[in-house]
């Protein structure tokens, strides 16, 4: 397969879709993508951390929302790609993100390919000439919170329904709030607590060639 993403939404799936609170990492494909012919619109991605993929976030279409994502170390493609072509991303809002490479092109710089739509309150390594990992607590050990001296702190802007409950004078840039919850993606509840001692996991079905 020559194309793909860990989370892939085609045109008809994008309106009203919300991709949030994920760690996406370690693949030769994209992290999360609104894909297709450019007719997709009104998708939302927020509070995702993406690293060690081949292109972090890619968005085609228009009137999407990209808020409070953190992305770095994603090969020779950019960390957040808001495509200038294939829909043009008119009306797309890119805000409160923190990434080493945010651009309107798969691999070209922000200076050569400015992000289309509305672009503000982002930390972009193309603009700062710094590494976003230097402003995170311990990214090598999966602690992506801003460290106490990080310039990400209070550098964002409030977004209703996304940054509610922020700490300080303004929301932080990126997927984590300094002093806020150290969230970890995935199921954290206990099966026994929810279903009781009688719960048993279903046995896999094997038909001689495939597990179902």
Can you annotate each of these PLM segments?
Residues 125-197, 202:
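C-terminal accessory segments
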Residues 36-143:
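Predominantly extracellular beta-rich ligand-binding scaffolds that present long acidic/polar faces
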Residues 1, 14-16, 27-28, 40-41, ...:
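Flexible loop/turn segments at secondary-structure boundaries
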């Amino acid at each position: 397969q020559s194309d793909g993403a860990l989370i892939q939404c085609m045109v008809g799936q994008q309106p009203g879709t919300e991709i949030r609170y994920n760690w996406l990492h370690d693949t030769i494909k994209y992290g999360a993508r609104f894909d297709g012919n450019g007719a997709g619109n009104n998708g939302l991605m927020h509070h995702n951390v993406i690293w060690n993929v081949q292109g972090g976030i890619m968005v085609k279409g228009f009137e999407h929302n990209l808020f409070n994502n953190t992305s770095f170390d994603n090969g020779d493609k950019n960390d957040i790609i808001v495509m200038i072509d294939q829909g043009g991303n008119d009306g797309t809002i890119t805000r409160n993100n923190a990434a080493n490479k945010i651009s309107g092109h798969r691999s070209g710089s922000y200076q050569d390919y400015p992000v289309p739509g509305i672009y503000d309150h982002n930390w972009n390594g193309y603009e700062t000439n710094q590494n976003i990992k230097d402003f995170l607590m311990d990214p090598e050990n999966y602690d992506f919170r801003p460290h106490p001296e990080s310039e990400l702190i209070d550098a964002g802007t409030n977004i209703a329904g996304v940054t509610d409950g922020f700490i300080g004078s303004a929301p932080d840039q990126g997927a984590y709030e300094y002093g806020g919850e150290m969230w970890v993606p995935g199921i954290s509840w206990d099966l026994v607590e929810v279903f009781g001692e009688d719960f048993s996991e279903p046995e896999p079905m094997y038909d001689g060639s495939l597990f179902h």
